[in-house]
From Swiss-Prot:
It comes from Macaca mulatta. This is Interleukin-5. Residues 1-19 form the signal peptide. Glycans are attached at residues 22, 47, 90. Keywords: Cytokine, Disulfide bond, Glycoprotein, Growth factor, Secreted, Signal.
């Protein structure tokens, strides 16, 4: 009986350990990265001759490739070391997160009604969250 109790507690402990997420949540990662960016802004703008393309419009979710190309350019021109490395590591993790989310855009054949529901939701987000230029 005692052995059964010990095994049950051991199994419960193992389940608890494996249930704890090993990765930092994306929202916390973004908050930390924003703080690091604010902290290291002066260091990052030290190279005043460097020019990085900036997307013209403000619908950032459409320009992720351009944003990450700019990050790559900035990283290659920045002296590495200390906490600035943490900034670029976080940006790399954010890029991986976005890449993983994009994979969820894969197509799955569904009924027209389900597609129209998705389209309506998409247009609703576009209407409320995107800056639509005239």
């Amino acid at each position: 009986m005692r052995m059964l109790l010990h095994l049950s507690l051991l199994a419960l402990g193992a389940a608890y350990v494996y249930a704890i997420p090993t990765e930092i949540p994306a929202s916390a990662l973004v908050k930390e990265t924003l703080a690091l960016l604010s902290t290291h802004r002066t260091l990052l703008i030290a190279n005043e001759t460097l020019r990085i393309p900036v997307p013209v419009h403000k619908n950032h979710q459409l320009c992720t490739e351009e944003i990450f190309q700019g990050i790559g350019t900035l990283e290659s021109q920045t002296v590495q070391g200390g906490t600035v490395e943490r900034l670029f590591k976080n940006l790399s993790l954010i890029k991986k997160y976005i890449g993983g989310q994009k994979k969820k855009c894969g197509e799955e054949r569904r009924r027209v009604n389900q597609f129209l529901d998705y389209l309506q939701e998409f247009l609703g987000v576009m209407n409320t969250e995107w800056i639509i230029e005239s």
